[in-house]
């Protein structure tokens, strides 16, 4: 199904649908008039004698070099080819397509001066499944994501590589097989295509969606862990959290309380429990996961604005009949958002790992067997699974260090402060993958611990979640080859199956709380 988007008004839900479901898109026809008006203004400037950056001049430090009218098309083509300097593993197809959609939205605002045919080829490539090969490294996030977007633009002119029908090939061949004619770039069009933050923003959005899913999963895995160690639900009382007032904290406490309602395990120790308080990793779950959710919402709002933004340079101001240079290509907002997401992901993993450590330690787990195995000594149980989570937690802590603070001058000091947003956003994929494993192992430990509490039963919602887990990860009755079980549990986190067990629809969908 083709989704019609209005430039400036795309929602995170629409963008997530496009990314997850391989949607084709088209721009709302109401955007066409503004696009054409801006292109006419650029054409007028290209035919004139005045130097206009990006239209009839060189680029960056070479902006003072005037280009003859007869060389304008060559200028744009040379720009694309010279900027195809990306390295590293290719960006995955879904994120590449999302990047193309974001570029379409930006150009569709009518402030870039490109021809309708340039937007139409992006629409056609999305509809017919021609996906440019985009090396994932090489952008410093100002002047936009130059290298990765140049590889996208190269495919549009029949250069570089693309994937079509599952096969990587020359982009010209891919376009031909899809029945698409490569475009010839007009004045400013090459610059409009590569100036922008769409690579960084696409990667950050994917990281955001993964973090939202993991935050919801964290509520479930903590509920399992809490019942496994016979923890208290008293700290989940609504009055505690409304007194503080943070929306995320309130929502997490309510959701976890609902997950644990009716647990026989919990009811068995409401009275007479010798423990006064649970460790922070149990007791402060709403405060930590709730804070993570709140910061994810803040980052999400930033990225939604950026997804609809014009981040080209120079900008075509049709009403004022001006083409003006600015700095909207600087991806600092995206870099900040990605750094915020990284901190949230790291903290979700840090507190979850402590719950795993709690459950496998017989001195802390309230009479659970060592390493959650029925025959400790002969069997090691989940001993090294916990060590794996510690390794991944530490890795994520390192990856959470801010990237935006690491600016370096480039391009002969013309571009002397950069955002590093691309790196900030890309590392989120690895961090979420690590967190998937930590939460998968926590789910395994929590379920195993609850089973040791028999004949007492957990709540109906947690039994349902355990049934989902047990369909893929059997109870660990004795030592076995563990890697497939960890992989299966992690997959249930990554694909959202466990998150779906939690009643946090607003957060899972990325809507305001």
From Swiss-Prot:
CDD domains: PAL-HAL. It comes from Roseobacter denitrificans (strain ATCC 33942 / OCh 114). Keywords: Cytoplasm, Histidine metabolism, Lyase. It holds the Pfam family Lyase_aromatic. Transmembrane segments: none annotated. Contains an active site 4-methylidene-imidazol-5-one (MIO), which is formed autocatalytically by cyclization and dehydration of residues Ala-Ser-Gly. It is an enzyme of class 4 (lyase). One of its GO terms (molecular function) is histidine ammonia-lyase activity. This is Histidine ammonia-lyase. The modification 2,3-didehydroalanine (Ser) is found at residue 143. GO terms for cellular component: cytoplasm. It is found in: Cytoplasm. Belongs to the PAL/histidase family. Its main location: cytoplasm. InterPro entries: Aromatic_Lyase (IPR001106), Fumarase/histidase_N (IPR024083), HutH (IPR005921), L-Aspartase-like (IPR008948), Phe/His_NH3-lyase_AS (IPR022313). There is a cross-link at residues 142-144 (5-imidazolinone (Ala-Gly)). It comes from the Bacteria. GO terms for biological process: L-histidine catabolic process to glutamate and formamide; L-histidine catabolic process to glutamate and formate.
């Amino acid at each position: 199904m083709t989704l019609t988007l209005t430039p400036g008004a795309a929602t995170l839900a629409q963008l997530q649908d496009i990314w997850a479901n391989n949607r084709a898109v088209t721009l709302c026809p109401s955007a066409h008039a503004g696009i054409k008006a801006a292109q006419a203004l650029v054409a007028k400037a290209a035919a004139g004698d005045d130097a206009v950056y990006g239209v009839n001049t060189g680029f960056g430090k070479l902006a003072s070099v005037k280009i003859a009218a007869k060389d304008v098309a060559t200028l744009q083509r040379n720009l694309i080819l010279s900027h195809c300097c990306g390295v590293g593993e290719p960006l995955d197809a879904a994120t590449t397509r999302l990047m193309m959609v974001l570029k379409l939205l930006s150009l569709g605002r009518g402030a870039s001066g490109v021809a309708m045919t340039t937007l139409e080829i992006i629409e056609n490539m999305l509809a017919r499944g021609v996906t440019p090969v985009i090396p994932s490294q090489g952008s410093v996030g100002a002047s936009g994501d130059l290298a990765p977007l140049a590889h996208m633009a190269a495919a549009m002119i029949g250069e570089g590589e693309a994937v079509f029908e599952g096969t990587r090939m020359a982009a010209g061949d891919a376009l031909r097989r899809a029945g698409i004619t490569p475009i010839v770039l007009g004045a400013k069009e090459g610059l409009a295509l590569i100036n922008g933050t769409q690579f960084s923003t696409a990667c950050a959005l994917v990281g955001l969606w993964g973090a939202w899913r993991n935050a919801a999963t964290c509520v479930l895995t903590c509920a399992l862990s809490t019942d496994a160690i016979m923890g208290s639900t008293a700290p989940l009382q609504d009055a505690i959290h409304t007194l503080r007032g943070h929306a995320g904290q309130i929502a997490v406490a309510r959701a976890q309380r609902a997950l644990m309602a009716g647990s026989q395990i919990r009811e068995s120790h409401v009275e007479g429990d010798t423990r006064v308080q649970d460790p922070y990793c149990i007791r402060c779950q709403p405060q930590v996961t709730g804070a993570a959710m709140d910061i994810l919402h803040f980052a999400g709002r930033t990225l939604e604005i950026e997804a609809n933004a014009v981040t080209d340079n120079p900008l075509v101001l049709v009403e004022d009949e001006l083409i003006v240079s600015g700095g909207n290509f600087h991806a600092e907002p995206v870099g900040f958002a990605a750094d915020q997401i990284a901190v949230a992901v790291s903290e979700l993993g840090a507190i979850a790992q402590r719950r795993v450590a709690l459950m496998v330690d017989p001195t802390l787990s309230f009479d659970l067997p060592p390493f959650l195995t029925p025959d400790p000594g002969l069997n090691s149980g989940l001993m090294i699974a916990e060590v794996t989570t510690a390794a991944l937690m530490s890795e994520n802590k390192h990856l959470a260090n801010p990237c935006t603070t690491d600016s370096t001058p480039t391009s002969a000091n013309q571009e002397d402060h950069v955002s590093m947003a691309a790196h900030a956003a890309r590392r989120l994929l690895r961090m979420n993958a690590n967190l998937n494993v930590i939460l998968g192992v926590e789910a395994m430990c929590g379920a195993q611990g609850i089973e040791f509490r028999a004949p007492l039963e957990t709540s109906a919602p947690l039994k349902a979640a355990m049934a989902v887990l047990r369909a893929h990860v059997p109870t660990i009755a004795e030592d076995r080859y563990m890697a497939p079980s960890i992989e299966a549990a992690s997959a249930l986190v990554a694909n959202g199956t466990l998150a779906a067990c939690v009643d946090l629809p607003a957060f899972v969908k990325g809507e305001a709380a």
